[in-house]
Each structure stands twice: as C-alpha cells, then as structure tokens.
Amino acid sequence: CNRMSYVVEAAIGIDEKSATATRGWFRIDPAACRVVLQGALTADRILLNARALGVYGASPIPQSGNDTLCIAQENFVIAAARQCRTGQTPAPFTQITPTQTDDGNLVAYLAEDSEYDDEQARLAGIQRLLVIAGYDAAPIDGVDGPKTQGALNAFLKSRGLSADVVQSPNFFTTMIDAVQS
C-alpha cells in the first residue's frame, strides 16, 4: 500500500530456498493498495524496490537496501535475479516484513517521513502534481484548505474536467497525463 505523496512503481523480490526472482512494475497511486502476490506465501524473504514516476524528476525515494537484484526498465519477471543479463540492471532491494490484516491478508506500507494516513497521502499526492503542473498548492502537507481547493479547481477548469473526476479511481492517471502534456 502506498502512503506516500508520489505515484510509485514497485518491484518485488522473492527469496525461496536458493532461488531469487524479481517481478515489476506494480503502479500504486497514493492511498491505494495493489495485490502483488496471491496464494500461500512460502518465501524465505520478501524484498522491495520502489521508484517514483519520471514526472517527479530524480526519484525522491531513497534507493537503498542490502540486497542487489536485477530489474528492467519496463514490466519484467526475472527468474535468476542475482545475475543480471542484457537489458537488466542491478538495483537495491530492502527486505520487508508484511503484517497480517484482520481479513488474513498480508500488507506492507510505503511511507514518507511525514507519516501520512491514506487521506493525507492522496491529498499530498494531488498537491504535489498541482505544483508540478504550475499551480500554487504549496505547502505539500496533505491538508485540505482554500489554497489547495483553488489550485485544484483552476486545474480542473483549465482541462475542462468536472469536480467529480477527483473521486474517480483513475484521477492520478488523469493528472499525470495532464502534467506531461
């Protein structure tokens, strides 16, 4: 689950017995969750690498970790992820320990130092993209106020979008497309 103010792409690494595999990219919007593994989890270790979308510039997400595993630029599944081949790049992965939810699923959260809850992460993500698009929605703090609403309304009006699009599940895709055009 993403509790950051960035739209991220995540890659997972699975260590099982003597084999390590990686898979990515899973796009996760702020305040959203993605299923990245299904079925019984038998892995010895689960590892994670995350990157912010290119629209943010240099990735603001620290690239650190104790394991170096192979990734690719586009979507990938790499079976032997400790020896990179052509088109694959070594990247740092961090071991994660998901927690069990009430419904029995395992969940792990990506978070910033600001420790946003889901609602704050979503709003901070919108503020961040508004600032990149040239609207004054600063500070990026996940707090709703007249300045954020004014910037959001100006953005929607300039793109000919109705206010209800903000609640749609594809709103971050809509914003990123607008920022990149």
Which positions does each model-derived feature cover?
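Cell-envelope/ECM-targeting effectors and their regulatory/trafficking segments
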Residues: 1-3, 11, 32-34, 45-47, ...
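Intrinsically disordered, low-complexity Pro/Gly/Ser/Thr-rich segments with frequent PxxP/GP/PP motifs
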Residues: 17-43
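Short, surface-exposed beta-strand/strand-loop-strand elements in extracellular ectodomains
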Residues: 7-16
